[in-house]
Amino acid sequence: MVEFKPNQRYPDPAVLILDPSFAKYRIYSSSVEQLGTGMRWAEGPVYFPAENGQAGYLLCSDIPNNRLMKYDEGTEKFTIHKTNVNYANGNTRDRQGRLVTCEHSVTRRIVRTEKDGKMTVLADSFEGKKLNAPNDIVVKSDDSIWFTDPIFGINGEWEGERAKSEQATTNVYRLAKDGQLAAVITDIVNPNGLAFSPDELKLYVVECGSLPYRCIWSYDLVADGTVSNKVKLIDANGSASIDGFRVDQDGNLWCGWGFNGAFAVEATDIDGGMKAHLPIAKSEDMDGVKVFNSAGKPIGFIKLPERCANLEFGGPKRNRLYMASCHSLYALYVESFGAV
């Protein structure tokens, strides 16, 4: 459990303007709220708008606890939605309003929850070999499903089950509407978060391997579903790590951001004349959400008491930023909304 007290005065000092262009997205009478806590590693937030008299709600994965959590906007309660979910990680909503999920565990697959609650397996292998551990997922307007497949979920028992990778590379896949699965990106180490630009002419992918592979790559999307023109848009090498992210209507990238354990150290005297190598962070940007414009320039930062793994725009006006962060789910109203 993480104790959190929201700021009692406006504007909230947790919302930082790094560039004047970010000022228009900050609501000066809005502050960061903690909506729920008690998770072990929060991931994969996905929002479902109000429908048929049911209030809007957000689901997120609590991976080590092998469950999905639910925040109900009507009751403002944070509860267990479903257990035994094969260590679900990333989630998204398709164009028909159905939940699509990345599973770890022994299943290592992409599944869709139908309106009647039944499960449909969409992909679990590529070229006859099991996927690694699908991580993050998005749906394009042509109904194709794009997802990343790093090895994090098979590295140990904490977020699934330890297993040997059957794939030669860690890929980004495109699952076409007709069910054909293609590896569209095969040359980056442990792809993680991914998203499209508002016009769907760009695909952004986080490379989240060991240093120095902590960055967001930008690709041009080709009409046939392939990509070209790989460009490094954002470089996060240092003490910070990017995980999941979302793109807003203006093309800004709102990135889950957090301390990754990369420290500089210095020798310091302690009792008895001994030397202790104490850590000194390489960067002041630690836990929260860092916002970049479409050119890769940092423009804003939202400080959180925990590392943010992933985020989602939701609410009736799609201007509530939900942030899945380690043990807790946080939210902040902003003058922006997610690109669809």
Ranges and model annotations:
Residues 2-31, 340:
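Blade/loop signatures of beta-propeller domains
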Residues 3-8, 103, 147-167, 256-283, ...:
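Short, conserved, GDST-rich strand-edge loop motifs in beta-rich repeat architectures
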Residues 31, 37-55, 84-103, 109, ...:
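Beta-rich, blade/repeat-based domains predominating
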Residues 63, 67-111, 120-123:
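Blade-loop segments of beta-propeller domains
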Residues 67-69, 109-111, 171-173, 215-217, ...:
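A short loop-to-beta-strand structural motif that recurs across blades of beta-propeller domains
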Residues 72-76, 113-118, 175-179, 220-225, ...:
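Short loop/turn segments that connect beta-strands within beta-propeller blades
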Residues 211-215, 219-221, 226-230, 234-297:
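Loop/turn-rich, solvent-exposed surfaces of beta-rich toroidal or solenoidal domains
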